[in-house]
Structure formats: C-alpha cells, structure tokens
Amino acid sequence: MELLIHRSSAIFLTLAVNALYLTSSQNITEEFYQSTCSAVSRGYFSALRTGWYTSVITIELSNIKETKCNGTDTKVKLIKQELDKYKNAVTELQLLMQNTPAANNRARREAPQYMNYTINTTKNLNVSISKKRKRRFLGFLLGVGSAIASGIAVSKVLHLEGEVNKIKNALLSTNKAVVSLSNGVSVLTSKVLDLKNYINNRLLPIVNQQSCRISNIETVIEFQQMNSRLLEITREFSVNAGVTTPLSTYMLTNSELLSLINDMPITNDQKKLMSSNVQIVRQQSYSIMSIIKEEVLAYVVQLPIYGVIDTPCWKLHTSPLCTTNIKEGSNICLTRTDRGWYCDNAGSVSFFPQADTCKVQSNRVFCDTMNSLTLPSEVSLCNTDIFNSKYDCKIMTSKTDISSSVITSLGAIVSCYGKTKCTASNKNRGIIKTFSNGCDYVSNKGVDTVSVGNTLYYVNKLEGKNLYVKGEPIINYYDPLVFPSDEFDASISQVNEKINQSLAFIRRSDELLHNVNTGKSTTNIMITTIIIVIIVVLLSLIAIGLLLYCKAKNTPVTLSKDQLSGINNIAFSK
C-alpha cells in the first residue's frame, strides 16, 4: 500500500511539474529590437542565492580488525574483498583528512593567502600525494574559496579536541540534533547508522563466529550495497581533494536532503521551491571533508539559501550590428555587451553577465548573487532607448563584420554580413527563409534550425509570444571615418566622446590648413606684385632708353665754317 501511495504521489508530482512547465513557458514573451540587434526574453521569476546553510553529516563506522575469511569459496572471497575495500576507504579518508581545507587552515577568502597556505602545507605533508592532485587542489580552492568559506569555518572547528565527542553525545538518542560548536555557531547534525548497524549486527557475527561461512550470495550483495556509499564518498573526496560539488546522492540521499530542507530556517515558500527543484539545489551545493575520528566520519554539507524569490527576471541576447552599404572590409560594427540575466532585487537590479552560471528550470531562474553586479533599475531603458540620458548603455565596437547567430528563448537573432549565406529551415519543408545582409530575427514557430555559413544552430521549442520592434539600425547614425574601432569595454557616451574628439581634431586640422593656405596666398600675391612692379620698372627703363636712342639717331649733324675749310677739314688734315 505504501509503495502504491508513493507511486501515485510521484505520478501526481510529474503531472503537476509538466503542467507547470507548459503553463509557465506559455507566459514567456520575447521582444526583438531591430535598432540595436538585441532581444529580451521575459516571463521568468527569480531564485537568487543570498546565503548558505551548513549542516554536519556523520557516518558511524565499525572497527573491523582481523577477519577469518580465508576460504576459497567465491562468496567468501567476495566478502573478504569488500571488507578490504572498507578498511582501505577508512585509511584513505584518514590520510585525506590531513590534506583537507579545514586541516590546512585554508578557509580565508583572499587568493594570495590561499596560495601561501597551500604551498606551505603541501611542502610539509607526510602523506604521499601526487603533484597532479596538489595542483588540482590549489586550483579548485582558488575557484570556490569564497563560496565555501562558511562551510570550511564549520569544518575547521570539528578538528578541535572534544568536538566530535560533543556531536556523538548529542546524537546518542536521536538521529538529528542541534549542536553548539566551540566557535559559538549552532549547526544541525545528523547521523547515518545503516552501515555500522549492518556490519556489527549482521556481517561480523557471520565472519567471526561462523568462520565466514556464508550460505547465500544475498549477504554479499547486501554488504556491497551498504558499503557502496562509504566507498563512493571516499572516491569523491579523494578525487576532488576534500571539496565536492554538485552534491551527490551518496553525500546526501534524496530523503536526507528533503528532511534537511524541511529543517532549514526559511519560509514555507522557500522550502517548497527547494523541495521541487532538488537537482538545481544539488548543483549549487557543496560537501566538505572534515574529520574521521572516534569511529565517526564527519563532513559538512553546505546548501544554498534562496533569499530572493518570485521577482521578475529577464534575459538579454545581443548580436553584432554592422553597416552593409559600404564596400567589403570597410564596414563598422557595434554590439551591446550587457547581455545576461537580470532580476529585480530590492529596488535595484541584479545583473548576471555570465548567463551560463544561472540554471533555468521551466520559468524559474536560479542564480548566485556572488556572480552578480548591482545596477540601477534604469538599466532597462537600454532596451528601448540606447541613447537615453539616465543610464549609459554598454557597447563594444569593431570594424570586423563577422556573421553569427544567437539562439534566444523563442527564436534566433541572425547577423549576416558579406558573402555568408544565412538561412532558417524547417525539418520537413527545408529552407523557409534566406536572410539578407544585416541583423534580423526569426521566431521558433515553424523553424527548427538556423544556418550561418557552415554552422548549424538548433532553436529552442518553448512556447510564447514574439514581438518584432522595427527601427533604424543605430550603426547607420555613425560616420565610418570617425567611428572608433576595437573599443571592447565602452559605453555610448564614451564612443560619442571619442567621435566628438575626432571631429574636433578634423575641424582644427581644417582651420590650420585654411590658415596655411591663406598665408601662402598672401605671400604669393606679394611676390607677384613685386615681380610685376619690377617688370614694369624694367620695361619703363627700356622704353626710356629706346626713346632716347631713337631721338639721338634722328637729330641732323651741323658743321661750322672752320670745319668746312680745307685747312681745318679734318678729312684733309694729317
């Protein structure tokens, strides 16, 4: 009867989830803005992690000493092999404990201090650990150091004398207890007794008292199943150097996870949200190796607390917007760089530029505020008016018109330039649309794939409403001669300022050139005038000379009487 109830509940839950998915996806709307080559997908709701909840899980172990399983029977060999695995796992955990983040005091946030602690402690390790594992450990810590700081702080306290016994005593008569640790932090602790009870009450009596005579294979299978959790936990901690994510079902079973969620100090809506999205919760959770002592394996489980839920969220998709009326190789391009997830949060907007860090389940967006930037609500104006005066919208510029496509929630943005062939296709009808040069958008209704050159994109098949907002591409407002290229982290105002600087420089150059030309013209006029004056003077002098010469030549010669006499005639004198 109980199984039937569980199956009925599971079927009901599945139907409810499917109904929720269909209903929520139909509420998604998408607006494409032709002027900026961008699209906004709306209709999502937030689940933002704002804190962490830490709990301590303890797995009680058995002290297995020498066993009497030395027979040749297959079942005996299997039991002995499984017992050896158990003891090896315990030994591996004991060695690993000396190299955990808590043991080596790596709970600080700063990356340089993480590195110093890691280098110093790995030098002094007496445990033989490969260099590959050390590098992986260091890199992992640098990546998640801030996220797991609270969990490591709890894990460190468990290394203090008496802390494990304090937890054991609190769990003597119950499987759960709130324990106040030495640092003043109270944590919920849970114990797992399945493995210890099976070994002590079922397995060891057979092994030691009956000389390991096993009558059926079921005993072997039962022990393997019981032992698998410890072996897998050991493997995960060993491979991941003591810190694992996501949270596996070996670290915390589904029933244990749901029970832990129910005990968290959060609202019923938050509990309902987490309980219905356990896979997302696991992806954003951590388990941290702490200590193995007093026949107890203790590790910390760190779960996300979603402090902001049910506020509107939207996703911005952007693609390059380039000119198309200029010869090939001379086009200019502009791309919005503010793509990502946005969620309303206490009067402002939480912006998640790395959209892949957010997980989407139907219309619910699970994001970590550690990966967010806080922006004013005016940032939304960039979608409808990129030149608005209240928020400086972010863009990048280039002079490389690369064709590409961006898959959105309800369609695809296609940036098609040059000689690239861009098409949209239906799996049954083939190509149904060929895109011309420029930025365009296609809905997923009747479209299965988008092809840009040799690249094929599959569109999402969510249902919703599409809106195509037409407008003049803003790139056409810019002059290619003064448009700044390769501005990878800029804004509209910065680009416009550089354009104004370029225009001012051009105007100044024109003025200088004009002044130079004016000076040259004046000089030329003066030189020409001087030359003309000189020529006129020379011509005047020549004219006067000629006039005097001609006048002198035309005057008759008159002789005196003495000159005409024979005596005084010079012609006869000698």
From Swiss-Prot:
Keyword Protein transport on entry: no
Matches recorded under Pfam families: Fusion_gly
Signal peptide stretch: 1-25
Chain positions of site Cleavage: 109-110, 136-137
Coiled-coil spans in chain: 76-96, 158-209, 481-516
Gene3D superfamilies according to UniProt: 1.10.287.2480, 6.10.250.1160, 6.20.370.50
Keyword Membrane: yes
Cystine bridges: 37-439, 69-212, 313-343, 322-333, 358-367, 382-393, 416-422
UniProt topological domain (Extracellular) ranges: 26-524
Top-level taxon of origin: Viruses
GO BP annotations listed: entry receptor-mediated virion attachment to host cell; fusion of virus membrane with host plasma membrane; symbiont entry into host cell; symbiont-mediated induction of syncytium formation
InterPro entries, alphabetized: Fusion_F0_Paramyxovir
Region Fusion peptide: start-end pairs: 137-157
Lipid-conjugated positions (S-palmitoyl cysteine): 550
GO cellular component: host cell Golgi membrane; host cell plasma membrane; membrane; viral envelope; virion membrane
UniProt keyword list: Cleavage on pair of basic residues, Coiled coil, Disulfide bond, Fusion of virus membrane with host cell membrane, Fusion of virus membrane with host membrane, Glycoprotein, Host cell membrane, Host Golgi apparatus, Host membrane, Host-virus interaction, Lipoprotein, Membrane, Palmitate, Signal, Syncytium formation induced by viral infection, Transmembrane, Transmembrane helix, Viral attachment to host cell, Viral attachment to host entry receptor, Viral envelope protein, Viral penetration into host cytoplasm, Virion, Virus entry into host cell
Sugar-bearing residue positions: 27, 70, 116, 120, 126, 500
Ranges per topology, Cytoplasmic: 551-574
Transmembrane segments: 525-550
Homology family: Belongs to the paramyxoviruses fusion glycoprotein family.
Protein name, UniProt field: Fusion glycoprotein F0
Phylogenetic lineage: Viruses, Riboviria, Orthornavirae, Negarnaviricota, Haploviricotina
